[in-house]
Amino acid sequence: MYALLEIRGKQYKVKENSTILVPGWEEIKPEEVKVLMVKDEANTVVGTPFVEGAEIELEPVKQIRTKKIKVRRFKAKVNYHRKKSHRIRYTILRINGIKTSVLTEG
């Protein structure tokens, strides 16, 4: 069984016991997770736009930061130099379960 999710404007294809990388360190509320489609061996449910009665159990595993990205600016002949850097923050989520109340013939 797998599902298509939308979390913070990005879509993910997930299976049970898999992990996904979601931008940001803020806690993900259940209303932020929108289920777009659920499919098992024989049946498929496609939402219009979301599947009613579908729930995904998420567990935050770890919060990480990417490798540092460095940005440099330079203007010739005027002694202008700027250096900035940042690291993107991500949360690793584990999918513990996919639950849906209705599966229709597809």
Curated annotation (Swiss-Prot):
Entry-linked InterPro entries: bL21-like (IPR028909), bL21-like_sf (IPR036164), Ribosomal_bL21 (IPR001787)
GO cellular component: a single term: ribosome
Molecular function as annotated in GO: rRNA binding; structural constituent of ribosome
Cited Pfam families: Ribosomal_L21p
UniProt KW keywords: Ribonucleoprotein, Ribosomal protein, RNA-binding, rRNA-binding
GO biological process: translation
Reported function: This protein binds to 23S rRNA in the presence of protein L20.
Family: Belongs to the bacterial ribosomal protein bL21 family.
Subunit structure comment from the entry: Part of the 50S ribosomal subunit. Contacts protein L20.
Protein name: Large ribosomal subunit protein bL21
Lineage, uppermost ranks: Bacteria, Pseudomonadati, Coprothermobacterota, Coprothermobacteria, Coprothermobacterales
Gene: rplU
